[in-house]
Amino acid sequence: MIRQLWTELNAAILFYTVLPLPQRWPTQFAGMSRWAPIVGLILGLILAVSDRLLAVGQFPLPLRSLLIVLLAIALTGGLHLDGAMDTADGLAVPNPDRRLEVMSDSHTGAFGAIAAIAIISLKTIALCYLPAPRSLLILLIPVWGRWAQVLAIVRYPYLKAEGKGAIHKQTGRGAIDLLPGAIALVLGIGAIARFHSLTVALQLLAIGLLWAWATGAWLQKKLGGQTGDTYGAIVEWTEALIWVSFTIGQV
């Protein structure tokens, strides 16, 4: 049992990031999607530590924030951002019957480029105004983004018979897949409540649940189902919208 969980986590790290793992470590890609939030926790830890190091190096806050956003993209190989771009191109097509075809096109259209600029800009600006505890929020928000992805996998049908995202739906175990991410979020939010602020902890819980549900639900309404691209879009937009929500009233 423990070996199976370990092999799934290894596969999730290889699939969702560019982080290297020893070749001798076993992998099992079936069922890996439930570990996406834990991968988000690993990425969040790298981002939070990097942010602190940049602060020690006295990098200006706007530059520091942009570098963190770019590092997040680099660590995933742009996987989720690419999905958000393809989704934007597809949604821009008036004819619903052609949306999946456009999303499958390897060429980036104008709306895809606009979506990428919007996501990077929103995240960077929001990070400049992110309240305390900044490091814990940077740590946990990537977990929320990927938990939202798992929620969409569990709740909604997959629109393609094949594709890079099909394995998520085909090998999922249902609502139980939400558990690893939920545990990570409960522990993280509990830490914020215990060591910093109950108010901030409750805000993170409420805002996270709102956008984790809303992004997938909105795409479901627009497309009638999900694809690998929409999973990426859910991750990116959930993160961006949570960060933006936390900046309201900070000026």
UniProtKB/Swiss-Prot annotation:
Source species, domain of life: Bacteria
Claim: Lipid biosynthesis is one of the keywords in the record: no
E.C. designation(s): 2.7.8.26
Pfam families: CobS
Membrane topology: Multi-pass membrane protein
Catalytic activity: alpha-ribazole + adenosylcob(III)inamide-GDP = adenosylcob(III)alamin + GMP + H(+); alpha-ribazole 5'-phosphate + adenosylcob(III)inamide-GDP = adenosylcob(III)alamin 5'-phosphate + GMP + H(+)
GO BP term, example: cobalamin biosynthetic process
GO cellular component: plasma membrane
Keywords: Cell inner membrane, Cell membrane, Cobalamin biosynthesis, Magnesium, Membrane, Transferase, Transmembrane, Transmembrane helix
Pathway in which this enzyme or protein is active: Cofactor biosynthesis; adenosylcobalamin biosynthesis; adenosylcobalamin from cob(II)yrinate a,c-diamide: step 7/7
Cofactors (names): Mg(2+)
Any one GO MF annotation of this record: adenosylcobinamide-GDP ribazoletransferase activity
TM region(s), chain numbering: 29-49, 65-85, 110-130, 136-156, 175-195, 198-218
Cell membrane keyword on record: yes
InterPro entries: CobS
Main location as per UniProt: membrane
Enzyme class: transferase
Entry's localization field: Cell inner membrane
NCBIfam families, per database record: cobS
Function according to Swiss-Prot or TrEMBL: Joins adenosylcobinamide-GDP and alpha-ribazole to generate adenosylcobalamin (Ado-cobalamin). Also synthesizes adenosylcobalamin 5'-phosphate from adenosylcobinamide-GDP and alpha-ribazole 5'-phosphate.
Family: Belongs to the CobS family.
Protein's name in the database: Adenosylcobinamide-GDP ribazoletransferase
